[in-house]
C-alpha cells in the first residue's frame, strides 16, 4: 500500500479536546485502573480503564502525549502503592515527610514508563503512519514491552503490572500458565485499545466504506484472544482423573516484620513454618 493509501485509512480527527479535559481524562484513567487493584480489586475495570487515556492522547503531539501519559501514570501509582508510606515509617523508621517524598519520587519514576508508552504510540502514528487498524496491536505490544523492561531495569520494579489485576478472575488468570502475566497485560491493552478505536470510528462521520472499515483486524484478534482465554480455562478446569476436587490453602507464618530479618529470630521463624 502506498503512502496515500495508508494515510487514507486514518481519517481526520474529530476530537478537539481542551487541555483541562485531556488532563482530566488522563488522571481519571490512572485512577480507574487503580480500582482494578487492591483494596478494591474490581478486575473487570482493567478491560476499560485505559480507554480515557487513549482518548486523551488522540490528536495530541508526541510531547503532549508524553505529559498526559506521565500524569496518568502518576495518578495510578499514587493510588495503588500509597501503602508503602506505612512500610517506610513503621519498619524503615523514616520520618513521615521523607516517606512522602520517597513515594513521590518512586511514583514519578514509574510514571515515566506510562509516558514512554503514550509518547511512542503517538510518535509511531505520526511518523510511521500506522493504519488505525494496526494501532491496537501496536499499543498492546508496546505496553507489554515496557512492563517487561520495568521488571528488570534499574534492579526492577514489577509491582502493579496490569495483568496482576486479574488475580481474582479465574477465567483470565489461568491464562498466566501459558503466557505469563505479560500475556494477560497484552490482552487487556488490546481490548482497551480496540474499544477506543471503535469509539473513534463511531464518532467519526460515516465514509464510503462505513465506520467500521479497517476495524476487522483488531476486533477479530481481540475476540479471538478472549475466546482462546475462555477455551484455555475450560481445558484447565477439566478434571482428568474423575476424582473429587480438593481445596488447597496457603497460610502465612505471621512473622512480625521487625523480626523477619533479625538473625537472632531465624531459628524461631523457621520453626513456625
Regions found by a protein language model. Name each.
Residues 2-237, 270-271:
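Membrane-embedded alpha-helical bundles of multi-pass enzymes
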Residues 233-273:
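Soluble catalytic regions of membrane-associated enzymes that act on cell-envelope
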Amino acid at each position: 500500500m502506498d503512502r496515500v493509501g495508508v494515510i487514507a485509512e486514518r481519517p481526520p480527527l474529530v476530537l478537539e479536546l481542551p487541555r483541562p479535559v485531556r488532563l482530566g481524562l488522563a488522571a481519571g484513567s490512572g485512577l480507574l485502573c487503580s480500582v482494578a487493584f487492591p483494596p478494591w480489586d474490581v478486575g473487570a475495570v482493567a478491560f476499560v480503564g485505559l480507554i480515557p487515556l487513549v482518548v486523551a492522547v488522540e490528536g495530541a503531539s508526541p510531547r503532549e502525549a508524553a505529559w498526559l501519559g506521565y500524569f496518568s501514570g502518576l495518578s495510578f501509582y499514587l493510588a495503588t502503592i500509597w501503602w508503602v508510606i506505612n512500610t517506610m515509617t513503621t519498619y524503615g523508621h523514616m520520618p513521615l515527610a521523607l516517606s512522602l517524598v520517597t513515594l513521590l519520587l518512586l511514583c514519578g519514576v514509574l510514571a515515566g514508563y506510562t509516558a514512554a508508552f503514550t509518547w511512542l504510540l503517538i510518535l509511531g502514528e505520526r511518523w510511521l503512519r500506522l493504519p488505525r487498524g494496526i494501532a491496537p496491536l501496536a499499543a498492546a505490544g508496546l505496553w507489554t514491552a515496557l512492563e517487561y523492561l520495568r521488571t528488570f531495569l534499574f534492579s526492577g520494579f514489577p509491582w502493579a503490572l496490569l495483568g496482576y489485576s486479574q488475580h481474582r478472575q479465574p477465567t483470565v488468570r489461568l491464562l498466566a500458565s501459558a503466557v505469563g502475566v505479560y500475556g494477560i497485560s497484552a490482552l487487556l491493552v488490546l481490548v482497551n485499545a480496540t474499544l477506543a478505536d471503535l469509539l473513534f470510528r463511531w464518532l467519526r462521520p460515516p465514509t464510503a466504506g462505513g465506520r467500521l472499515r479497517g476495524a476487522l483486524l483488531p476486533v477479530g484478534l481481540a475476540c479471538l484472544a478472549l475466546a482462546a482465554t475462555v477455551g484455555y480455562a475450560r481445558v484447565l478446569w477439566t478434571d482428568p482423573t474423575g476424582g473429587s476436587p480438593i481445596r488447597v490453602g496457603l497460610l502465612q507464618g505471621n512473622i512480625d516484620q521487625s523480626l523477619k530479618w533479625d538473625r537472632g529470630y531465624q531459628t524461631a521463624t523457621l520453626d513456625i513454618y
